[in-house]
């Protein structure tokens, strides 16, 4: 089970290619390229990477404001995805790492504009 962020601010520290999140008494480095998607869970967020899951005490909106919008896109009120990890796009969801992530009707057009289609 992932550990909740116990830091004072709860805010991840973000550099251009990595973020640092507080887990217990230490800061853990997560490469931005390894983040698959981020899921909101009330006032918490779960960051899913290729190998781990991290639970942070921060809202999805606060994370969204800090992430590079060229790489990440909010596709639902509860999800932000890393565009480079999309495996498939269906009518109402995207597949990332065998997980179906819902795409809101209002955000679908933005998603389709951001991905290259032939």
Stretch-by-stretch model annotation:
Residues 110-118:
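C-terminal output/interaction extensions
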Residues 92-95, 102-105, 109:
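C-terminal structural segments of small proteins and small subunits
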Residues 2-96:
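Conserved binding/recognition cores within well-folded domains
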């Amino acid at each position: 089970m992932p550990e909740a962020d116990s830091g004072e601010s709860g805010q991840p520290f973000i550099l251009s290619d990595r973020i640092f999140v507080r887990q217990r008494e230490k800061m853990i480095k997560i490469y931005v390229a390894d983040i698959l998607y981020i899921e909101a869970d009330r006032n918490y967020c779960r960051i899913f990477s290729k190998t781990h899951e991290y639970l942070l005490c921060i809202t999805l909106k606060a994370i969204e404001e800090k992430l590079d919008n060229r790489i990440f896109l909010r596709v639902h009120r509860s999800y932000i995805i890393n565009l480079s990890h999309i495996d498939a796009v269906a009518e109402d969801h995207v597949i990332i790492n065998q997980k179906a992530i819902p795409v809101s009707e209002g955000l679908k057009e933005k998603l389709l504009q951001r991905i290259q289609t032939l």
